[in-house]
């Protein structure tokens, strides 16, 4: 009995030591599902209207640490050619050298540098935004919509995570100054992201 007790205690001690030294689960990669994500920005046009445009093409991923969201990160690339206002002539103007200059700067990128958890579902995501060849730190006010399993029976089943975020940027900070201030310098941005572990589909 004494030998059994000592063996049990030794095993328990070793197990506790191993658990204490074990590394926490690493963040897992979730690919952005462009078909269910969107980035919309708007501006004031000479005081008369407030048009919007969107980016239809979104590439990137979320490194999601479900145990500690502050250890998560996000990386997004937007091909400027995917910009869509619904008006072909306006699309052409916004992609021209007067604005985004898509030929010279074909992508917009965002890479997070810090994630802070705010309350139950809130996040403050700080990162490097590169537009028009200029990189600036911006902060997104974000919220977690849902983390769980996305399933369409018989079609697919995959771990998924959804987020919404907003921010306001000054386009002049990125060297895009055409028509400022008649066309607003401050640009509100709304983001919704759906990210999935697509390799898990079945």
For each feature predicted by the language model, list its residue ranges.
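Low-complexity, acidic/polar, glycine-enriched regions of mature
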Residues: 19-202
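Bacterial N-terminal signal peptides
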Residues: 7-16
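Positively charged n-region of N-terminal signal peptides that target proteins for export
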Residues: 1-4
């Amino acid at each position: 009995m004494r030998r059994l007790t000592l063996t049990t205690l030794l095993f328990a001690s070793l197990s506790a030591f191993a658990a204490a030294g074990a590394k926490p689960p690493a963040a897992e990669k979730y690919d952005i599902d462009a078909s269910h994500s969107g980035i919309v920005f708007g501006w004031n046009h000479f005081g008369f209207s407030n048009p919007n445009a969107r980016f239809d093409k979104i590439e990137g991923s979320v490194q999601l640490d479900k145990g500690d969201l502050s250890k998560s990160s996000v990386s997004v690339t937007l091909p400027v050619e995917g910009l869509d206002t619904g008006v072909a002539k306006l699309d052409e103007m916004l992609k021209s050298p007067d604005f985004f200059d898509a030929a010279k700067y074909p992508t917009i990128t965002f890479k997070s540098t810090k994630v802070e958890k705010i309350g139950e579902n809130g996040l403050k995501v700080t990162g490097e935004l590169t537009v028009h060849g200029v990189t600036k730190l911006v902060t997104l006010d974000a919220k977690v919509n849902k983390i769980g399993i996305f399933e369409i029976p018989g079609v697919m089943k995959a771990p998924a995570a959804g987020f919404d975020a907003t921010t306001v940027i000054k386009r002049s900070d990125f060297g895009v100054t055409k028509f400022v201030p008649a066309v607003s310098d401050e640009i509100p941005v709304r983001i919704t992201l759906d990210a999935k572990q697509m390799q898990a589909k079945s």
